Amino acid sequence: VEMIASKVSNEFNHLCSDTNKQQSDLNSNGTEQDKSLVVHKKRKSQQAGTSYAQSCEVKEYQRLLRLQPKSDEDNDSSFSDCISSPSSSSHFGDSDTMTSDEDKDNPLSSVNSTPRTQSARAQKWPRPHTDSVSSLLMKRPCYQVSSLRRPLHRKRFVKNVSSQRTQKQKERIMLQRKKREVLARQKYALLPSSSSSSENDLSSESSSSSSTEGEEDLFVSPGENHQDGTTLPSGGMDEDVVVIEASSTPQVTANEEINVTSTDSEVEIVTVGETYRSRATLGHPRSHWGQNSQSGRTQEQRTRNRVSTIIQPLRQNTTEVVDLTVDEDDPTVVPTTSGRVESQPVSIVSSLTSTSEPASDSMSGLMGSAVPEIPAIPPNTVGTIADDSRTCTSGANADGGPPAMPRLPSCCPQHSPCGGSSQNHVLGHPHSSCFPPHSHHFPHHHHHHHHSSHPGVPLSPSFRDSHCTVERNAAVPPPCGVSSSSGSTYHDPQALPVDLSNNGIRSHGSVGFHSTSAFDPCCPGSSSRSTVYGHQATTSTAQTMAIDGYGSSMVAQAQPPPPLSSCRHYMHASYTSLPRPLHHQTSSCPHSNSASQPPPPPPPPPPPPMDYVIAHQVPFISPLPSLTSTHAVPPPPPSHHLSAAAAPLPQHLSTSHQSMSHHISATAPATQRLHAHEVIQRMEVQRRRMMQHPTRAHERPPPHPHRMHPNYGHGHHIHVPQTMSSHPRQGPERSAWEIAIETGVTAAPYQTGPLHTHLAPYHPPPRLHHLQIGALPLMVPDMAGYPHIRYISSGLDGRSFRVPFRGNFEELIHLEERLGNVNRGASQGTIERCTYPHKYKKVSTDWFSQRKLHSKQDGEEAPEEDTEEKCTICLSILEEGEDVRRLPCMHLFHQVCVDQWLITNKKCPICRVDIDTQLPTES
């Protein structure tokens, strides 16, 4: 402990200064993902490096999170933390715009809550640094959840300049550190089964938050509430739960040094290894932990905010994760035993999430990989696994995004199946399943979004929503995603765009999936993923749960991503946002707030990868109905997103749709309408782009909304639409899509009731937008099968995308032929009148022969050309008696040859003199 303490103090000093750099340590979230059940979701916003390196910083930052309700920078950092818990979410949300009443009300909710707030305020870290996920987790962990599971709305910590924690806090941290270390060591020994310790296995989720850099990070996410004595969800750990999950490939082993520092109300995350810190150093907000917690956070997560300390190397996708998590609200932690099985995939997802920015695509791939593993796990575990899967996806994604794309399709399928299996499955497995696709799209997109949002507004992973909680608790820990996504924390309005993104992930299983992608607020992945996941959750779980989680994720994403991919997010917004409001209208509002602030950050993420955001898939729509109720809140964000994403319309389209979705959920129909307009504009922009690349449009048929959305919006970027569209529900969705398009209500096929009101004005535009940007180009191939799409494409820009070209082109050709013959060609009568046809006769045959002979005698070889004439059209020598035609220019050709030429061109083939210009010389 002393060693750790010393190291932590040393590293903390360094980390405090290099919060951003430390962000990269989030990669440990891969392992963290293993604890999918643990609702602890770290957002990509959280930087693993920051988390680890910021052990002290984390602690301080936790205070900050509490004290900085409206600090964009803090929001970014806290964004990841928020995902871990409502408290985190509030602190995390801390997005400037997102101040939550709960934050203020809940400071006293739990003992740690107040100290935490105070310490957070004392610290006041700049969120822009994107505090490490761990730190975020530490700061706004469960204590809030335990007390009230603060909604996103409650203000997070205000930025506090002081980054030093009081002596008392330090002592507490040391005690907690020792305690956690013991627990961690114990669990470390139990690595294989550590996942089973259901103590808020946020470690996996935290792992997700950890940066996706290659570094292995250990996320220690001690719940300050744990210190308060809140019973651990899964109990073996008293105040703090230290879950060290070792994936098949333990990440921590290499970096065994695990420094966990936490004060009673604050948790400090100590970098497990230098690598981890470097990750944190990266300073890229990660939404990984959001992913991780998504699955991991089951109903428990929903019902409780938890402070988690996750010690987990992010670098290695599969790594032990030390999850110190306590849900103040829900002492019981969903066991992550099954999740443990999923630990590696989760780790990957975590990594993926952390890499969301840079490894968005990878994320998808990893997710895809993780997904396969998840299916094996039992339903209950599925939630955890889903979380793990997300984490895993993140991790894998960090390693390679490409795989995600293939996974994406599989994810979609799983989406469909998982949705059916059980809430837990839906939230967990489907999330994982869908997560990869979203991860894939969104990773690019999401990655960008996340990146974008983070810079401007660190993602606030813990964006739990108490509302979400309700939905989240639907059936088993629909977990991971649902419980963690739906966590009150998730709904932190403060979670800025990024925060919201993460929140979405955390809020519900659906969102959880989305979160991984959605970590990048603007990232289509984020939104997209959330969408996909949300759809599953909504579909199979309770729409409420899915919607709740989804909404959070969507909303969270919407805020940050809109700028990145306004259209995409918008599209998603309809789907995602709508579900979100159900449980989190405030969240929606936060999105709006976030949207306002995030627009600047999102622009950076024009992530073609986001294309894969296909995850937006109509799944989002499923939750939409619930979302619609709360949608009115975020009208502003849509515009921001749209404007921000306007430029990278294609990529942003998906993200934008998602974002839009989120916003819409937050925003009301008004926002939806606004989005619709924005979307239409963007669609037009995209369309123009697409017009430039008509072939692509033809290449990409939009089989279903999934494809039509992020991917399709991004279509020209990723073009994984085929793969993605190969999702099992592609067929059904496609029909739904067609119906929606035909009816003009994009959401109609996917949801009914309120959604229509909100979505009708907005949704159709997003869809149209997608169609135009991604779908039109994509749809051109099968446009014949989708007349409504064709109409949309033609209606959007006032002309048919395909028909006009076809008809006009043919007409032009015919016209050219007609005009060409008249203008350029000559009639047979004109030819006969202007030329001199006759039988060829070698006039100078004798002379030529004599000359030839003479030349030979002189030893000079006379060229035959001099003695013989050739038809320059057929290049044959003119023979005696052949029908030839002499033109006014005196050039001689075979009649057959020259007549064919003159029919198309009245000019001499040799000198280009018009036969009409001179009188024929018939002599």
From Swiss-Prot:
Segments crossing the lipid bilayer: none
GO cellular component terms attached to this protein's record: cytoplasm; nucleus; PML body
Pathway: Protein modification; protein ubiquitination
InterPro entries: RNF111_N, Znf_RING, Znf_RING/FYVE/PHD, ZNRF3_Arkadia_E3_ligases
PROSITE patterns, sorted: ZF_RING_2
Region of interest (Ubiquitin binding), residue spans: 836-838, 886-890
Motif (SUMO interaction motif 1 (SIM)): 241-245
Biased composition range(s): Pro residues: 597-610
Motif SUMO interaction motif 2 (SIM): chain residues: 266-272
One of the record's GO molecular function terms: SUMO polymer binding
Entry EC no(s): 2.3.2.27
Keywords associated with the record: Cytoplasm, Developmental protein, DNA damage, DNA repair, Isopeptide bond, Metal-binding, Nucleus, Transferase, Ubl conjugation pathway, Zinc, Zinc-finger
RING-type zinc finger span: 871-912
Keyword DNA damage among record annotations: yes
Activity regulation, free text: Binds free ubiquitin non-covalently via its RING-type zinc finger. Ubiquitin-binding leads to enhance the E3 ubiquitin-protein ligase activity by stabilizing the ubiquitin-conjugating enzyme E2 (donor ubiquitin) in the 'closed' conformation and activating ubiquitin transfer.
Chain positions recorded as Zn(2+) binding sites: 871, 874, 894, 897
Biased composition annotated in UniProt, kind: Basic residues: 441-453
Extent of Low complexity compositional bias: 77-96, 193-212
Pfam families, per database record: RNF111_N (PF15303), zf-RING_2 (PF13639)
Localization in the cell: Nucleus; Cytoplasm; Nucleus, PML body
Protein family membership: Belongs to the Arkadia family.
Domain text: The SUMO interaction motifs (SIMs) mediates the binding to polysumoylated substrate. The RING-type zinc finger mediates the E3 ubiquitin-protein ligase activity and binds directly to free ubiquitin. Non-covalent ubiquitin-binding stabilizes the ubiquitin-conjugating enzyme E2 (donor ubiquitin) in the 'closed' conformation and stimulates ubiquitin transfer.
Subunit details: Monomer.
General function of this protein: E3 ubiquitin-protein ligase required for mesoderm patterning during embryonic development by enhancing signaling of the subset of TGF-beta factors responsible for the formation of dorso-anterior tissues of Spemann's organizer. Acts as an enhancer of the transcriptional responses of the smad2/smad3 effectors, which are activated downstream of BMP. Acts by mediating ubiquitination and degradation of SMAD inhibitors such as smad7, inducing their proteasomal degradation and thereby enhancing the transcriptional activity of TGF-beta and BMP.
Protein name: E3 ubiquitin-protein ligase arkadia-A
The organism of origin for this protein: Xenopus laevis (African clawed frog)
